[in-house]
Each structure stands twice: as C-alpha cells, then as structure tokens.
Amino acid sequence: MSGPRDQPGKLAPLHGSAPDDPLRSDELRSGEVRLGAVRLAATDHPLGADRDRISLVVRNTSRRVVRVSSHYPLERANPKLVFDREAARGFHLDIPAGASVRWAPGEEREVGLVRYGGLTGEERRSPASIATRPAPRPRISAAEWLARYGPTTGDRVRLGDTDLWLRVQEDRTAAGDEPVWGYGKTLRSRMTQHDRATGSSELDVLVAGALVVDPVVGVVKADIGIKDGRIVGIGRAGNPDVSDGVDLVIGPHTEPIMGYGLIATPGAVDSHVHLITPELLPVALSAGVTTLITAGFEEPPYVMERTLRALESWPLNIGLQAGARADVPGRLEELLAAGAVGFKIHEDYGAYPELIDAVLAFADAHDCSVSLHTDGLHESAELEDTVAAIAGRTVHAYHVEGTGGGHMPDLMGLVREASIICSSTTPTLPYGVAAPIEHVAMTLLNHGGLWAVPGDLELVRERIHPATMAAEGPLHELGAVGIVNSDSQGMGRIGETVRRTIQLAHTMKGWRRGPAAEGVPGLPAELDDPYDDTERILRYFAKCTLEPAIVHGISEEVG
C-alpha cells in the first residue's frame, strides 16, 4: 500500500485500492452530502385502502372555526356542522391520517369520505343518501407521504453521510389508518385506539411506522409492538374496530412512540467489553449497544454476584464472562454457579495449550461459550499449537488482527479454521493512518507496560502490524471475520461499535468496486445498483447484533 503524493511515507486508509470516484452519488461528488437522503420510488401514492367513498356538503353554522380530524367519526362531529349525518354513518374524512379539515364560520364545502375498515365498516353500513355521490380515491404526493409517515416500499434511504443505500423491501403499516399521536391526530379514543382492548391483548408500548433494519427480518416499514418488556410483533398496529388487518392492538394503556422517519435496529451486542467502570453503561446505551458481554476479569464469584445485583436496575443485558485462569477441577464450576455466561482465556493470565484444551472440554460439557486471547509471547505455544489444542471445537477468537494481543505476526491465520469464530475490534476499523500509532500507548497502558523500560516498548512494537490491520476490512467483506466488537477500556471504545461497523461497510463498498478487489470472489447482484446496498448493510449489521448473540448462546433473547 502506497502513500498519497502529498504525504510521502504515510499510509492512507485504503489509498489506491478504489477508484477516485467510486460511484458516489451526485450529492457526494458536489460535496453537498444530504444526510439520510431518500430517493423516492414513485411520484405519488393512492390514499388509504380501496373502500367505499362518497362526498357530501358540510356547512359550519358556528361563529367559531371548527376542525375535524381524519378519523373522527363524522356523524358525531360538532352539532353546528350541518350535513346528512345518516349518510356519514360509518365514514370518516378521506384525508391523510393525522390531517384535519377546517371550516371557517359560515363556510360550506364539499368533502370526501371513506368507509371505516374493521368491524365498524362492516356493521355500520348506511344506505346511500341523496346528499351524497360517489367520490374517487384521492392520491397523495410521495414527498408529502415521506414527510408524514417516512419512506415506503421501493424507496431508497441513505445511511447518514455514507454511500450506503437501503431499499425498503416491504411496508406492513396500515396505509390510510396510520396511528399518529398528537394534537388532532389519530391515536385517540374511537379512532386507532381500541377502547375495549383487554389487558392481555393491548400493547404496552407501540413504536409506530419505523423502518426496521434487521438481519433476519430485512428492511421493513412496520409498527413494533412491545408487551411485558419484549417485542411481540413487527406488523400493523391499530384498532380492529376501524382498521383492517390489525395484528397489534393499541389500547388505552399503550404508550406510543412515533417512529415515522426513523430507523429501528436490534440493539447491538458488544461481545468484548472490559467493564471496569459503570460510566460505560450510558455511553453504550447512547450508541445503540444494549447487550454487553464482558471480557473475562469479573471473578471471584462474590464480585460477580454483587456486580450482577448492582447492574439489575440498568436497562441493559449484561453477560459476565469469567476468566479461565486454571484447569484445577472445581474452579470453573464455581464461576458458572456465580452467574458466568461463559469463559475467557487470556494470555495475561496464561493461554497454554493444556489450559485451552481443559476449558473447551469443560465448556462442551456445560454448554457454554469460550473466548480466546492467544499467547503473543510464544512462550508456551505458537499458532499451530493453539489450533491443535482447540482441536476443531468452537471458540471465539478476539481481535485477530493481532494488535490487541495474541500470536505474532500470524494470528490472522485463525480465519482459516472453520470452528474458530473470529472477531475484530473498532479502533482498527476501517483502517486508517492513526491506528498503528494509537496502539503503542494503548498496549502499554492496558497491559502493565512502562515507557521507560526498553523491553516493554519492544514487546509492544512487535504486536503492531499495519498490514494485518489493513487486511481486516477485506476479510470482513469476504465473511472470514464475522464479528465486530469494541474491546472497550482495552483497545477500543464502546460508543463506536455500531458506527465503525457501518463505516466499514461503506469503505468496503468502495474497495469492492476498485482494482484491489479484482479477482476476489464477488457478490454480483449487490454490485449492479449503486443505490441498493440492502444486503451489504444487513450483513454488516449482523456483525454487531445477530452473530455475537449466536456465538455467546443468547440469540433466543437478543440480537
């Protein structure tokens, strides 16, 4: 890798590996990046469902302005609005959900009405009246739809300031019957709120109209229902009395959160966290990390038990990995009984082949996970010896670029082993010029080294290999490295776990299209459309959500 001409001798991130203009959008080429820009798939959309529609004339006899919102039962509207109320029975205004119609004092206007869906639409049919006539189905501009309810099927959404574009694959919301909370909106009694909902059926919390980005579900516009602290559905929320196809019931006790125009993802699982201070917890939450797997220094059992109690009030999932520091019978059992979610083998406490073998045998017998930080001194074993000790059993190998510790300089060779699940940490992703420099201080600080001791500096510098750092991105792109975590309070920062993962996906999009990737196995369908990176984004999101959850045995609960 060469340096740029104006910085001789310096390494630039992936310099020369991608074209100067790697299919960037017009906004990026002009320097005017529109954060979260949306490319609309249509110019307009039909309003609401295909139901009976009529129009009638309404006159305001009041001395005051009267407004009626979209889903208010028109037949029950202000008595000083004069119109054929029998004809309006079972209908509501045919306008966007959450909008309203205004009548000035004395004003008369013709309005369109649409029949309610659900039970109301079926049970409260009234005969046609001479005061009404059929009305066409109105349309709403795609721009207004986006402003009110967020993107819909086929729309493309840019992730932040990256060159990654999501394509909305499906819209499960109730078009025309959206639950919208606020002044004059639809999430009220007799509208999208089901007043007779039972406690067992109504949601505790509704996240309405979010763009769900999930490695399993895909990219779906949907309402998210929460009950008893768990997500119980991703679908269509509302009141079955007035809307069709409702599978998530909004009741009088449901707390609404408006997700229109927002992205909802699974909470990230940071599977390498040194939890040495509670100050990490708000940082994790603010950055989208909701599950922490600690890095294995939480023993003795008394401390583990007290730690779990102390963290009980935090809205986070905490898994304490215990340090596997001895293969003496009975010691690991004590840690499991104290609440350990798994074990961590670390070179600072010994990563000998016989210890690796014993701990993996114990983990297999007790169905728990093991994470591994290998012997960087080569004091007891080299890479091949560690692989032999693992013997085809499943283990999670941390920071395989080697800078965080482990066999030097060839730790990355672990990616060849099918049973070894490799991860890398945020401070080297995506690779940049400051990464090698930063890690000299990091390694000394976190591993008991001293600047004044030449031997300590020599050990540190032997660990830092810019070439393996630079190789991490392409190996992630090929799937050889499957997890991103932070090594917070060790190598990295918990506030960067999600952000660095997405930045890596962005960088690798450019690398994949550049000359450095020629001859590398590709994903052809993904390369066809520069405005559809959906599969890439889902793959990379899995690296900090689903994949670590599976590896640590908690995917039934999180990820």
Regions flagged by a language model, labelled:
Residues 110-136:
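Terminal connector regions
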Residues 83-119:
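Intrinsically disordered, low-complexity Pro/Gly/Ser/Thr-rich segments with frequent PxxP/GP/PP motifs
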Residues 213-223, 535-541, 549-559:
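Acidic, glycine-enriched loop/beta-strand segments at the rims
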Residues 65-87:
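Short acidic, flexible loop segments centered on an aromatic residue
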Residues 135-196, 235-236, 246-247, 251-265, ...:
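Divalent-metal coordination cores built from histidine and acidic residues
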Residues 56-64:
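Asparagine-centered strand-capping/turn motif at beta-strand->loop junctions
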Residues 345-538, 544-552:
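Active-site core of metal-dependent hydrolases
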